């Protein structure tokens, strides 16, 4: 799916759940949500982990 993440690390929209709201943390630039973990860098989703939070 497509994630649009702003420079503050907030996921603005997700085409996976169409809710546009996922729990996030700007610490370590991690966006953690229901569908796994995204590693964000300068507003870009570089990596997604489909099976939930895990050690990076």
UniProtKB/Swiss-Prot annotation:
Quote the EC number. Answer: 1.11.1.24
According to its UniProt record, where is this protein located?
A: Plastid, Chloroplast
* Keyword terms of this UniProt record: Antioxidant, Chloroplast, Disulfide bond, Oxidoreductase, Peroxidase, Plastid, Redox-active center
Q: What class of enzyme is it?
A: oxidoreductase
A Gene Ontology cellular component where this protein is annotated is: chloroplast
* Reaction catalyzed: a hydroperoxide + [thioredoxin]-dithiol = an alcohol + [thioredoxin]-disulfide + H2O
Protein's UniProt keywords contain Iron: no
**Disulfide bridge map:** none
Q: Which GO terms describe its molecular function?
A: thioredoxin-dependent peroxiredoxin activity
Plastid recorded as keyword: yes
Task: State the oligomer form and interacting partners.
Answer: Homodimer; disulfide-linked, upon oxidation.
Role summary = Thiol-specific peroxidase that catalyzes the reduction of hydrogen peroxide and organic hydroperoxides to water and alcohols, respectively. Plays a role in cell protection against oxidative stress by detoxifying peroxides. May be an antioxidant enzyme particularly in the developing shoot and photosynthesizing leaf.
Give the family, as the similarity comment puts it: Belongs to the peroxiredoxin family. AhpC/Prx1 subfamily.
Q: What else is known?
A: On the 2D-gel the determined pI of this protein is: 5.7, its MW is: 22.8 kDa.
Q: Please report the name of this protein according to its UniProt entry.
A: Putative 2-Cys peroxiredoxin BAS1
């Amino acid at each position: 799916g497509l994630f649009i993440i702003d420079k503050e690390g907030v996921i603005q929209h997700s085409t996976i759940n169409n809710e546009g709201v996922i729990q996030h943390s700007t610490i370590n630039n991690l966006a953690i949500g229901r569908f796994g973990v995204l590693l964000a860098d300068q507003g870009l989703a570089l990596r997604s982990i489909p099976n939930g939070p895990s050690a990076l």
